[in-house]
């Protein structure tokens, strides 16, 4: 059992939905992003997704691409991202952390080395957007052997033939991308997403979390209500990018979390 599994079990017992928040590590600098990260649990965040900045983020929309660029320009590296996690874990042993990004930085570091460092730092799961199930032997299976959850994305184009393959070695939760395309695009509508979430839930016992396009507490409530929770990324990253004070960012996160928890 990972911290992710424990969190969903607790939320189920409380009759609550999960609120997942995404931030980019090192955006706009290490100090600010760590301050935001430290404040997320108190703001109501159940699971933290920590973006690993990468030079070619093909699945990300402009908001998150720009955040990654700012982080890289500020000197953020995979080593510093792991240091961030260690600093957070020195104060918080409960909140699950999922690292999200691309395979290249992990491959460059060496899978075995990365997994040893990630587990030691206190990472609970990985989302690697450019590794399909056909390449599970590369990272997914070694990650699970190391005790990490490997979380997979399903999309509106994941048809019934493809879905079992996507779910095959997935653990922790399934991340349903409610809009086809890049992150932070048009808003998702609960009525459109509900049948797709039901289709995925019929094929797995794992929790299903809906993401992409959620910007308001009302949308968080609507979308969390048809799934096991929701994730907000671009709306939070946008505030950081605008240079808003950490307290203001966290107030906004708290409002979004309250929306999800009201579902």
Swiss-Prot record:
Pfam families: Trp_syntA
Residues annotated as catalytic: 49 (proton acceptor), 60 (proton acceptor)
Listed EC numbers: 4.2.1.20
An example molecular function term from Gene Ontology annotations: tryptophan synthase activity
Amino-acid biosynthesis is among the record's keywords: yes
Reaction(s) the record says it catalyses: (1S,2R)-1-C-(indol-3-yl)glycerol 3-phosphate + L-serine = D-glyceraldehyde 3-phosphate + L-tryptophan + H2O
Superkingdom assignment: Bacteria
Keywords, sorted A to Z: Amino-acid biosynthesis, Aromatic amino acid biosynthesis, Lyase, Tryptophan biosynthesis
Pathway note: Amino-acid biosynthesis; L-tryptophan biosynthesis; L-tryptophan from chorismate: step 5/5
GO cellular component, as recorded: cytosol
Disulphide linkage map: none
Keyword Lyase attributed: yes
Quaternary structure, from the entry: Tetramer of two alpha and two beta chains.
Family: Belongs to the TrpA family.
Role of this protein: The alpha subunit is responsible for the aldol cleavage of indoleglycerol phosphate to indole and glyceraldehyde 3-phosphate.
Designated name of the protein: Tryptophan synthase alpha chain
Organism: Cereibacter sphaeroides (strain ATCC 17023 / DSM 158 / JCM 6121 / CCUG 31486 / LMG 2827 / NBRC 12203 / NCIMB 8253 / ATH 2.4.1.) (Rhodobacter sphaeroides)
């Amino acid at each position: 059992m990972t911290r992710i599994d424990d969190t969903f079990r607790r939320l189920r017992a409380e009759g609550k939905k999960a609120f997942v928040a995404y931030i980019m590590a090192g955006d706009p600098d290490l100090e600010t992003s760590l301050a935001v990260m430290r404040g997320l649990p108190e703001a109501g965040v159940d699971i933290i997704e920590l973006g690993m900045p990468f030079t070619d983020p093909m699945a990300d929309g402009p908001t998150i691409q720009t955040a990654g660029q700012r982080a890289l320009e500020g000197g953020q590296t995979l080593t510093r991202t792991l240091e961030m996690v260690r600093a957070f874990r020195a104060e918080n042993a409960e909140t699950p952390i999922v690292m999200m990004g691309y395979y290249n930085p992990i491959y460059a570091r060496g899978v075995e080395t990365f997994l040893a460092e990630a587990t030691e730092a206190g990472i609970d799961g990985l989302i690697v957007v450019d590794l399909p199930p056909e390449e599970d032997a590369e990272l997914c299976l070694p990650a699970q052997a190391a005790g990490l959850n490997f979380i997979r994305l399903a999309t509106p184009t994941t048809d019934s033939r493809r879905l079992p393959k996507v779910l095959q070695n997935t653990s922790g939760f399934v991340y349903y991308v409610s809009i086809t395309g890049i992150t932070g695009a048009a808003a998702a509508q609960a009525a459109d997403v509900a049948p797709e979430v039901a289709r995925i839930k019929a094929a797995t016992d794992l929790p299903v979390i809906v993401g992409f396009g959620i910007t308001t507490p009302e949308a968080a409530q609507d979308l969390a209500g048809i799934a096991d929770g929701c994730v907000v990324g671009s709306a939070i990253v946008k505030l950081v990018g605008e240079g808003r004070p950490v307290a203001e960012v966290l107030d906004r996160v708290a409002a979004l979390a309250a929306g999800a928890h009201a579902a």
